[in-house]
Amino acid sequence: MRQGLLVALLLGTCAAVSAQEATARRPEPNTRVPKGVQRYAPTGFPDRIVASPAQDAATGFSVAWRTDTKVDAPLLEIVVAGDSPDMGEPRRVTAISTLLKTENGSAHHHRADVDGLQPDTLYAWRVQGDRTWSAWHHTRTAAATTSPLTMLYFGDTQNKNVSLTTRVVREAMRHAPDAKLALYAGDLVSGGDGEDDNEWGEWFEANEVLPTSLVVAPAPGNHEYFEEFEDTPQERRVLGAHWPVTFALPGNGVAQAKKTTYWFDYQDLRVVVIDGTSALDLGTAKAQAAWLDQALGSNPHRWSIVMTHQPFFSPREGRDNVALRKHLLPVIRKHNVDLVLQGHDHVYGRLKSPPPVFVVSVTGAKQYRLSDEARRTMRPVAEDTQLFQVLHFEGPRLRYEARTATGRLYDAFDLVDEGGKGKQLVERTEGRIDERACTRAETLKGRADRCWE
């Protein structure tokens, strides 16, 4: 009897342990695509549609999209948007098509450049597939330099895009329904895991209507590159095949990093995108600095932003991007850049300094820990926090807000152009929540150097 009772107790204990193990939290994969399942195969229907600004965003923009290989040199149709379904005879632009082979099969990625548009005009446009078309999308061209502008800035998305980036993008669009431009500070996907195309599919799914409602300008991150000949004397960084075909970016970058650097004008703002990975790992920092000097030196506008993936002043322990500070930082200071927007370190930190204002942010699921140096030199800082940023330009005032995934205000300041006195930073503390710190000892994978992954 006792023996039977003991066996029953042991079986019950084992069953309870098994139940706990079955419901225990486990690390989530980067994509929701189960092994052996093909979720993002290209078809004759256009997908991964994204608009990006032309060099002059008042008179043009470009569109990239994807289909299967049956579609070659398809059309983009564009017309001034109207209230009737009959918007008139559209203009037709023929796209250039590029083949890309991935784990999801072969696809054609298309690019159409639209020029000759009228400023501050709402256009309707659609792209062609195999005997079919996309929906009609709306894009408004940039207005006069004196017009207000609202834009969004996202740090790294990178991991678990559909699972956890989606909610941040939705919250951002709720808080900035009038935004016309979105900047992404690199590492849009993780890559290098045999699921690169699945990850890009999830990035577009997570961003939903944003890439066809706003114009999108991304910076390349180190995860947009891969290591070729790894662990050999020939090891080197190589730009991934998706980057040049996924976005239709301005082709005005420095020759040594032509596909990953560019600039454009949007109303009273010039945005210059540099490639930190190329600067640090491929020796192009000096060339990029000379090009940046020209791009900023010819800026006729009141405002300027430089965006790069790797920070000039890193808030994460153990990272120090010396080549950026040596070659590119003097150019940024010389031209009195207003904002330097960065990612890479998966925390939030704003350097305590007058303009230029250096900001590092993160949108995605991967969360690192702050260094002691960052806690001394940056304010505010944050760990374990998904964020988006809203920037509003109106005349002599730039208003910046960093908000959490639930929309709570985390950081806010104004830059005010006082004419001869230059740009002055005005802190806005009302309504901000308290600084956030990671309270977990380690991640689900047992890593103490990260807060979440």
Across the structure, where does each feature detected by a protein language model lie?
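Active-site metal-binding loops of divalent metal-dependent hydrolases
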Residues: 129, 154-159, 186-188, 222-223, ...
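Short acidic, glycine-rich surface-loop motifs adjacent to enzyme active sites
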Residues: 185, 189, 299-316
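Extended active-site neighborhood of metal-dependent phosphoesterases/phosphodiesterases
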Residues: 111-113, 122-138, 198-300, 319, ...
